[in-house]
């Protein structure tokens, strides 16, 4: 559900305080047909609730399940402020990352950092090890990569929704699945093909896009054969992948996560929490102010 560019853009707009149908149309440039479809799915999947306003238009408000996506959007904000939006076309002002973040408890501007709950060490991408979780043997083929298999979007929708780098990666189910697989250590075309159950033509297209976006780089290692490795820009997306996993494990398959991560420095199963980079306190959604 959250691996869709329009869905992510709508949710981010709601987090920023815009909740009405007309707000989404005017600020996102989304067609009414696509907007109606995505809002219906967000309500059906209990991420949003349609709240009637006496004498006015209804509002779409975040449910507990929707509010729990705030750490993922925090990770997205962090990536965008460090790496830019990667503008392909003009990105509307409403979607530009706000430049500063304040922790209202200590009153300081700060950069958040993701720490291990057990050892309090800042989590680094290659200090983790993926392991089969309790639900590994029961998931449908092709979902071992932590994300559900992509449905076909129309080319028009995809083009309109994916205006910049982050949405082109996270907002496309196959691209986000490839990203997650790369963090698992997969590097070869055949490994991606087997793990994701993706057709060779589609895989070639997606790898080509991730190369063009600077998320992956190709390296020849045996004649004409290539392996695909994450760039620094791609590695920096690790907190986003972690938060997508965390949300899915909590709300989609509680107690039956298909994949778990072990934090190698402390040898515990990884549980991460965001902390203030200034006072080191654990952050909560209501204690963060973007401006």
Region locations from a protein language model:
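Basic, amphipathic "hinge/linker" alpha-helix immediately C-terminal to the N-terminal HTH DNA-binding motif
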Residues: 3, 54-75, 223-241
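Short amphipathic alpha-helical interaction segments
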Residues: 30-43, 197-212
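Short, Lys/Arg-enriched N-terminal segment that forms or immediately precedes the first helix
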Residues: 1, 143-167
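N-terminal helix-turn-helix DNA-binding core of bacterial DNA-binding proteins
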Residues: 1-31, 97, 115, 161-202
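C-terminal regulatory/oligomerization modules of transcriptional regulators
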Residues: 81-154, 253-291
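Short, solvent-exposed amphipathic helices
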Residues: 65-86, 236-254, 258
């Amino acid at each position: 559900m959250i691996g869709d560019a329009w869905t992510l853009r709508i949710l981010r707009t709601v987090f920023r305080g815009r909740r009405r149908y007309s707000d989404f149309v005017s600020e996102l440039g989304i067609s009414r047909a696509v907007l109606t479809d995505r809002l219906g799915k967000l309500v059906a999947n209990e991420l949003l609730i349609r709240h009637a306003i006496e004498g006015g238009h209804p509002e779409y408000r975040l449910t507990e399940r929707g509010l729990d996506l705030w750490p993922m959007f925090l990770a997205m904000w962090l990536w965008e402020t460090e790496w830019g939006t990667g503008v392909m076309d003009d990105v509307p002002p409403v979607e530009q990352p706000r430049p500063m973040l304040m922790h209202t408890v200590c009153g300081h501007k700060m950069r958040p950092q993701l720490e291990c709950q057990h050892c309090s060490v800042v989590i680094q991408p290659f200090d983790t090890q993926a392991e089969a979780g309790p639900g590994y043997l029961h998931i449908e083929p092709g979902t071992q990569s932590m994300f559900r298999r992509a449905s076909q979007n129309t080319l028009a929708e995809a083009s309109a929704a994916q205006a910049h780098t982050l949405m082109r990666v996270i907002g496309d189910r196959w691209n986000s699945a490839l990203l997650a697989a790369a963090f698992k250590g997969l590097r070869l075309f055949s490994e991606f093909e087997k793990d994701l159950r993706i057709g060779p033509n589609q895989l070639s297209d997606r790898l080509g896009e991730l190369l063009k976006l600077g998320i992956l780089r190709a390296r020849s290692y045996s004649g004409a054969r290539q392996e695909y490795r994450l760039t620094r820009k791609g590695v920096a997306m690790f907190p986003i992948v972690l938060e997508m996993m965390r949300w899915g494990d909590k709300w989609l398959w509680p107690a039956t996560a298909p994949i778990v991560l072990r934090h190698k420095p402390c040898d515990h199963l990884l549980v991460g929490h965001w902390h203030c980079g200034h006072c080191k306190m654990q952050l909560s959604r209501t204690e963060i102010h973007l401006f």
